[in-house]
Swiss-Prot record:
Gene3D superfamilies on file: Ribosomal protein L22/L17
Protein name: Large ribosomal subunit protein uL22
Biological source species: Exiguobacterium sp. (strain ATCC BAA-1283 / AT1b)
Subunit text: Part of the 50S ribosomal subunit.
Gene Ontology biological-process annotations: translation
Family the entry assigns: Belongs to the universal ribosomal protein uL22 family.
Any one cellular-component term (Gene Ontology): cytosolic large ribosomal subunit
Amino acid sequence: MQAKASANMVRLAPRKARLVVDLIRGKQVGEALSVLAHTNKAASPVVEKVLKSAIANAEHNYDMNIENLVVTEAYVNEGPTLKRFRPRAMGRASRINKRTSHIHIVVTEK
């Protein structure tokens, strides 16, 4: 049985969020939480929140044992991009892309 959790439209660049998600894929849930707690990246608290949500879903919806949970799938997809403009010299403007991410985590019982 699988338990899933996701966070959509998170204001993090997908490339930076993938660095954090790659650290927890395939690990036990307790180990993954400790890795996230000691990772000094902006995406760590967001990924930790999604992982805790997946754990809560597994426990509440499917009566799974938390000690046996493993992160089987963890991936980040690109969300919509917010486009902003920054004024530059001589009346010009440059476009700034503010990227968003969709973070998905799936846990299963081992």
